Amino acid sequence: MTETNKNIHQEAEQEITLIDDQGNEELYQVLFTFDSEDYGKSYVLLYPASSAEDEEVDIQAFAFTSDVAGDASQGDLFPIEDDEEWEMVEEVLNTFLADDNMQ
């Protein structure tokens, strides 16, 4: 099991615009960010800003570098390409969702 900093940061209404291969822009909300000591990276999980609260959504995950204030919406996003890294991100997301459903 990987060692992940369980310090999950829920962001206050941060938005990020993603641009797809065809140049289409879509606005996303930051669900939360977290740091992994094993990978030495920070991660951001996003969902479409246009989705309704009760709607099932596809959550996007990226490694990121933040600005000097730690703002994920002002830094650079990088794809997660390693399978083990993806498994770690999914584990953190599943824990977050399970904890969120308990409240």
Swiss-Prot record:
Superkingdom to which the source organism belongs: Bacteria
InterPro entries: UPF0473
Bridged cysteine pairs (disulfide): none
Family: Belongs to the UPF0473 family.
The protein's name in its UniProt record: UPF0473 protein LCA_0390
Organism listed in the record: Latilactobacillus sakei subsp. sakei (strain 23K)
Lineage: Bacteria, Bacillati, Bacillota, Bacilli, Lactobacillales
